[in-house]
Amino acid sequence: MSERLVTSNEIGIDSTNEYSLRPEKINEYIGQDKVKERLNIFIKAAQRRGEALDHVILYGPPGLGKTTLANIIANEMGGNLKITSGPAIERAGDLAAILTTLNTNDVLFIDEIHRLNRSVEEILYPAMEDYVLDIIIGKGAASKSIRLDLPKFTLIGATTRIGMLSSPLRDRFGVLCSMEYYTDEQLKEIIIRSAEILGCHITEEGAFEIAKRSRGTPRIANRLLKRVRDFAEVLYDNEITEEAAKKSLEILEVDGEGFDRIDNKILEAIIDNFNGGPVGIETLAYFVGEELDTIEDVYEPYLLQKGFIVRTPRGRMATDKAYKHLGRVRFNESKIDSKQCTLFEK
């Protein structure tokens, strides 16, 4: 397949019916209960004071609903949502052009905000603190600074790497929200809701079968639902049952853990070629046939999170959980308890 179905990053298929599947109000939003509770209080307090909501940072893995939350906040505050990203704002003038189009209570959503360059950040500081925009006109000795007033708006920054935000920028956000992976039950609710919007019939068992393979991520859950729906329409009388979901996902090469072919290939390489490890990441990438960065950034995090591999000072090792998943028997004595093993960065 040209695009990986279980990646948490956005791919082409996600744009189909994407906005129709998103909740519009905070009470419609499933999951992230702690974040939702805090934001609900902050929104109501801002409304009672007649103020803009304080600036918000949403951080956590991709696909967990940061853009959806930003849209909900804009709706609740009675403003419009303007979406951009850190890499798209190359110059200070690009940001100034966006800021000057905002109206009161609008929400400016900057995805990958950790990738803003420093010159752009400096424009943001007075805009966030004092709702003003300082513009330099002219060059050299003839240049002069002009200050423009901005409407009271809310900046929402989204990042998968909160540690990469500069301290001056991070300190200007009044609300910091950590987004967590979803439970299978929460994903089941999301899938049932999405199926209703898409007009396909799904049983609770069918929804749960998709949910448990969705890697804790709504974006993946909705993506798998769309593909299973295709199979249901052609092969299963437009009904997604547990059996229909299982067989469809088997054909799509997404197993019961949400692993695809490459995930399993990584585990097979460690166990079959290196007796369970340890094996260096460069060697592992060679055996799997993927780039080193791809292994580290795309595949490894979920395998680590689920406890199928661990990092040690000497390399990656497969856990008993990985052996069981592949139906292999461990013959050596170097058993690993993934709950007790320290995870080393490299």
Swiss-Prot record:
Q: Which residues are Mg(2+)-binding? A: T67
Per its record, the protein catalyses:
ATP + H2O = ADP + phosphate + H(+)
Region listing for Large ATPase domain (RuvB-L), in residue ranges: 1-182
UniProt-listed Gene3D superfamilies = 1.10.8.60, P-loop containing nucleotide triphosphate hydrolases, Winged helix-like DNA-binding domain superfamily/Winged helix DNA-binding domain
Major site of localization recorded for this protein: cytoplasm
Q: What does this protein do?
A: The RuvA-RuvB-RuvC complex processes Holliday junction (HJ) DNA during genetic recombination and DNA repair, while the RuvA-RuvB complex plays an important role in the rescue of blocked DNA replication forks via replication fork reversal (RFR). RuvA specifically binds to HJ cruciform DNA, conferring on it an open structure. The RuvB hexamer acts as an ATP-dependent pump, pulling dsDNA into and through the RuvAB complex. RuvB forms 2 homohexamers on either side of HJ DNA bound by 1 or 2 RuvA tetramers; 4 subunits per hexamer contact DNA at a time.
Q: Belongs to which family?
A: Belongs to the RuvB family.
**What is this protein's name?**
Holliday junction branch migration complex subunit RuvB
> Which species is this UniProt entry from?
Clostridium perfringens (strain SM101 / Type A)
Query: Lineage in the entry?
Result: Bacteria, Bacillati, Bacillota, Clostridia, Eubacteriales
